């Protein structure tokens, strides 16, 4: 390959990279792999992306640069042949309550434009299309009749405010008009004026003006029209020209309105250049009319959120498996309030209301009767009606009594906006339709159904021409969402309810939709949250991106994606200071084959590459020879949150349970939405309301704690670090305070903290650096001149333990610290050994979970999502005496290499051996095959998911043909 076809990186030194030289082929699909902490992200993001972004920003004017993220030059000698770079990282894209899948992918923006351009407005009264008429419409109307048919062109008489009808008619006569039409009769204007002197009714009319005249005509049910012209249907050019002129005149005189009358039957047709119908004025569609983030389009009641504070249905009816008779309506329980229930049942009898049917099985009409009143209630006085709405109206009226105020507060919460019904838009937006559907109906459809609807959409040639570009953008983006396995989502799904994997794939779709060419796309584990079934689809999407003319670089651990890549770069061999070297770089042709001789040659050539060892199956994650036997369990019955279909699930205790299923099958709903909050409430802890379920049975009391271990940062402050999180730093400070010099100087453990005043450097507040804002350039981060980056005052740094001061210890990696504090050769003082043992015991779990490479004082903000999760795991392992706990992990293998997964499984086993229980949501087959018990949900995502497909040991799941997870397990 010619030299210019490579992106050449020389001397990369970011973080732990060891001055490496890397060549990345342009226009190819490249995978960067390696164990966690080996330096993959340092190469891909801190070097490649940072330089690509910096060069782009540097090319802009200084004025534009002040509004953009300012980036420093990465640590490397040079980078050649680098195109503009785009990074798609692992992160939840939005916590904004207004952000949706539609707005994140920009599909909604194109939908808004589509409805503004070709949407047709329909009257909610008659259902007829509302449009501005032109003279062409009048010509088309006349052509319904045979040639020679006579007709009259009329204009409704428009009288301005300070002029009477008499004055207006006299003005018409001066302009040359001779007749008017009223009550189906043609009358000369002068005759009408003369009769006005004799007829008192006409006299009042002639002397009226403006609003008064309009009101009188309305009361008398009269209409008066000015006769503009009389003509007959003809194809002659001159006649058509005359018709157009007369029609224009009629529109002018009639203030935008015109009428055609065909005598003698007097059939009439109304036309208007105003946007109105059925006596209603309509707003012409604009893109802002469909924007819930704009005051022009947002529902005025909920301001575009779709929900308001009101009576929350989930609080009134928390258990939808109960029937009305069984007391599903909580506020109608008890002797006094129960009278409402009895009265409703009595009145509902003629309508055959199913009082014994569970609430969730009621039809929408039956729910409306219960909430808003039976049909017969409309004739009754408000105080004599019986419904949930009327009940709370009564409660509000009695708010001056304390018990009613308390009751009202119990049932208040977020509820669907009563005006827009959760659509977030003004009602006028729903009058505009394309193909019989409004924009709110389209965003409520699943992406699978929406894509099919657009494929079958029939438009006129003119509409196709107008919408051509918009439809292309919409259909391409919808197809991308389908290709990455998100067909079960809807466009109005809130972004802050998506999982990390879903968020990243939506982020990917947004970038794919822009169809840039000649760029470098750098993706951080795009396979997160993807079932093995969907990986092939993801590879297809990445290939499409590459075929546009882009270089696609993925930081990835998925074996299938590694094998699909054109070029593999392995950074390692291990993590932290033991990593940062290039241990393998080669094209697809060099990948491991099934030939043992070739595999052996590859292993000998690249002995340090863990990736090659796993790809050649030289190293493997072994399936356990047996599974733990369990006899205690928690059983959730009737789980119905989101798409769960009332399933009953047993979750065994004291074993390793994995919940599997394709993306959108209901895993998070079951575990994060029901199990976790329900268990917290059982333990009297603060928790969100759990999703719907009938009951939780079994050995619930056997669990004393519940912990949800996610990938959020371990500390809210950038000052938080692994040593403080695992409480090892308390012992380190105690050790330094125990030294003779510290005692002599009166230094307590507080003096060795960089978070409190006393021993820390006050110039940089213990950070070791100061930040200087530079308006047009990247902010300068300078080493603090007072402490020279050592974070503490000089006299604090004089205190040593075995030749190391507090700053030296904070700069040690976990592995170095364990080695240092375990070294028996260190000359320690009385009492120091206890501190050292405590430090080692608290740091050892970090080493066990594969985080031996991170520094003790490393800011938590620099840790990846997977690293944060493993720090939390290490914290729980370090807690010696802990009551039986249920641990819930959400995709703990994120960011983990095969080599790291082995350690993770060992850590899981350590927790179970201490009497704890593990529930893990996971797609990684190496983890799934090691489980004691699998709960597989599906079979598909969204509407086609939510069922319990199979539960049992990995062998039992592998034998189930209906299970997609089982099919992949069977291949192992």
Where are these regions (language model features)?
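Conserved phosphate-binding elements of NTP-dependent enzyme cores
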Residues: 1-972
């Amino acid at each position: 390959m010619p030299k210019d076809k490579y992106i050449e990186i020389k001397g990369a030194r970011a973080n732990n990279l060891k001055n490496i030289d890397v060549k990345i082929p342009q226009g190819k699909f490249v995978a960067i792999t390696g164990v966690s902490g080996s330096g993959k992200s340092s190469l891909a993001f801190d070097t490649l992306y940072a330089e690509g972004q910096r060069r782009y920003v540097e090319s802009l004017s200084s004025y534009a640069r002040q509004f953009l993220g300012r980036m420093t030059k990465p640590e490397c000698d040079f980078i050649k042949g680098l195109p503009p770079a785009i990074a798609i990282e692992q992160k939840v894209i939005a916590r904004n309550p207004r952000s949706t899948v539609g707005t994140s992918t920009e599909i909604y923006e194109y939908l808004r434009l589509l409805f503004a351009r070709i949407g047709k407005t329909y009257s909610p009264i008659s259902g007829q299309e509302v449009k501005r008429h032109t003279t062409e419409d009048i010509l088309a109307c006349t052509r319904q009749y045979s040639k020679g048919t006579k007709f009259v062109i009329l204009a409704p008489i428009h009288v301005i405010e300070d002029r009477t009808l008499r004055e207006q008619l006299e003005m018409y006569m001066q302009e040359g008009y001779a007749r008017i039409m009223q009550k189906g009769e043609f009358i000369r204007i002068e005759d009408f004026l003369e009769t006005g002197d004799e007829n008192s009714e006409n006299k009042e009319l002639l002397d009226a003006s403006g609003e008064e005249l309009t009101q009188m005509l309305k009361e008398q049910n009269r209409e008066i029209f000015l006769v503009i012209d009389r003509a007959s249907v003809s194809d002659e050019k001159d006649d058509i020209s005359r018709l157009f002129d007369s029609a224009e005149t009629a529109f002018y005189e009639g203030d935008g309105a015109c009428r055609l009358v065909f005598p003698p039957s007097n059939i009439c047709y109304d036309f208007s250049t105003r946007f109105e119908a059925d006596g209603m004025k309509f707003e012409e569609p604009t893109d802002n009319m469909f924007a819930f983030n704009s005051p022009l389009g947002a529902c005025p009641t909920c301001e575009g959120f779709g929900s308001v504070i009101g009576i929350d249905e989930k609080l009134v009816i928390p258990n939808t498996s109960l029937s009305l008779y069984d007391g599903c309506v909580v506020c109608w329980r008890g002797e006094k309030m129960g009278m409402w229930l009895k009265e409703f049942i009595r009145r509902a009898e003629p309508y055959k209301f199913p009082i014994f049917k569970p609430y969730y099985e009621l039809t929408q009409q039956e729910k409306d009767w219960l909430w808003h009143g039976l049909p017969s209630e409309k004739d009754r006085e408000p105080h004599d009606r019986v419904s949930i709405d009327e009940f709370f109206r009564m409660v509000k009226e009695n708010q001056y009594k304390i018990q009613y105020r308390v009751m009202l507060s119990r049932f208040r919460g977020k509820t669907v906006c009563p005006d827009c019904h959760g659509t977030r838009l003004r009602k006028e937006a729903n009058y505009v339709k394309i193909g019989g559907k409004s924009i709110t109906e389209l965003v409520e459809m699943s992406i699978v159904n929406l894509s099919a609807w657009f494929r079958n959409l029939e438009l006129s040639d003119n509409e196709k021409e107008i919408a051509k570009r918009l439809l292309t953008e919409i259909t391409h983006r919808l197809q991308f969402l389908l290709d990455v396995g998100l067909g079960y989502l809807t466009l109005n799904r809130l972004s802050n309810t998506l999982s990390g994997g879903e968020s990243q794939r939506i982020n990917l779709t947004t970038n794919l939709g822009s169809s840039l060419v000649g760029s470098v796309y750098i993706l951080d584990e795009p396979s997160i949250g993807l079932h093995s079934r969907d990986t092939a689809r993801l590879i297809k999407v990445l290939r499409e991106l590459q075929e546009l003319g882009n270089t696609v670089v993925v930081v990835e651990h998925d074996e299938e994606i590694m094998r699909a890549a054109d070029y593999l770069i392995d950074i390692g061999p291990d993590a932290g200071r033991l990593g940062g070297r290039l241990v393998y770089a080669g094209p697809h042709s060099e990948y491991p084959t099934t030939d043992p001789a070739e595999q052996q040659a590859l292993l000998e050539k690249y002995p340090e590459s863990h990736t090659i060892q796993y790809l050649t199956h030289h190293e493997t994650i072994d399936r356990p020879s047996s599974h733990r036997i369990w006899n205690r369990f928690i059983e959730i019955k009737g789980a119905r949150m989101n798409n769960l279909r009332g399933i009953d699930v047993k979750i065994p205790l004291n074993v390793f349970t994995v919940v599997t299923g394709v993306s959108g099958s209901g895993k998070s709903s079951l575990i994060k939405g029901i199990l976790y909050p329900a268990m917290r409430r059982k333990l009297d802890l603060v928790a969100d309301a759990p999703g719907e379920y009938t009951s939780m049975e079994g050995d619930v009391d056997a669990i004393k704690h519940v912990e949800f271990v996610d990938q959020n940062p371990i500390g809210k402050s950038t000052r938080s670090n692994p040593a403080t999180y695992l409480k090892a730093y308390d012992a380190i400070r105690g050790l330094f305070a125990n030294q003779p010099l510290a005692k002599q100087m009166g230094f307590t453990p507080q003096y060795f903290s960089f978070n409190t005043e006393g021993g820390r450097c006050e110039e940089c507040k213990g950070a070791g650096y100061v930040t200087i804002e530079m308006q047009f350039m990247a902010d300068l981060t300078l080493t603090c001149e007072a402490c020279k980056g050592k974070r503490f005052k000089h006299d604090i740094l004089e205190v040593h333990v075995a030749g190391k001061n507090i700053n030296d210890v904070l700069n040690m990696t976990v592995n170095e610290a364990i080695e240092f504090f375990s070294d028996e050769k260190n000359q320690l003082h009385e009492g120091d050994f206890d501190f050292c043992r405590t430090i080692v015991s608290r740091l050892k779990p970090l080493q066990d979970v594969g985080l031996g490479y991170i520094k003790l004082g490393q800011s938590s903000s620099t840790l990846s999502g997977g690293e944060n999760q493993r720090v939390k795991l290490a914290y729980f392992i370090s807690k010696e005496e802990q009551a039986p706990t249920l641990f819930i992990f959400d995709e703990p293998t994120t960011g983990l290499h095969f080599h790291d997964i082995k350690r993770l499984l060992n850590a899981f086993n350590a927790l179970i051996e201490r009497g704890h229980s593990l529930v893990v949501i996971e797609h990684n087959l190496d983890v799934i095959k090691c489980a004691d018990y699998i709960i597989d949900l599906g079979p598909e995502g969204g509407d086609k998911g939510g069922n319990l497909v199979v539960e049992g040991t990995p062998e039992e799941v592998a034998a189930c043909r209906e299970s997609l997870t089982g099919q992949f397990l069977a291949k192992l």
